[in-house]
């Protein structure tokens, strides 16, 4: 996938690291971008949980997302998945207000071995949650991965 930094991102290049994939609706969803910023703000807590990197994925064109990522000073990869190929592979567009035309609000933690260690989908009915405080996300991750907290 194309990154807002102009490079092509390939998850296989992150082998040996835990990567939190954050699938979101994109530039028209301000709470989604607030979530992206909050993930960056809480990077130390995520690292303490074993998350080496965060990646944000949406279906908007990379040039549009580049402006938003720059405005928000996001330092981690922001990726464009315009045909929803990666999103569909992770079923991230199965949940959310827009049906399958856009991602919902899904998180997938890919472990160092490339396997999914944890996932959660917050964008679906009945609540359509577009922002989850990161401490709540961390608590959900701890519970889902059975890490004492």
Residue ranges and their predicted role:
Residues 11-39, 53:
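Short active-site neighborhood of thiol/selenol oxidoreductases, capturing the structured segment around
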Residues 66-104:
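Short, internal strand/loop/helix patches
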Residues 12, 90, 119-120:
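Short hydrophobic alpha-helix segments
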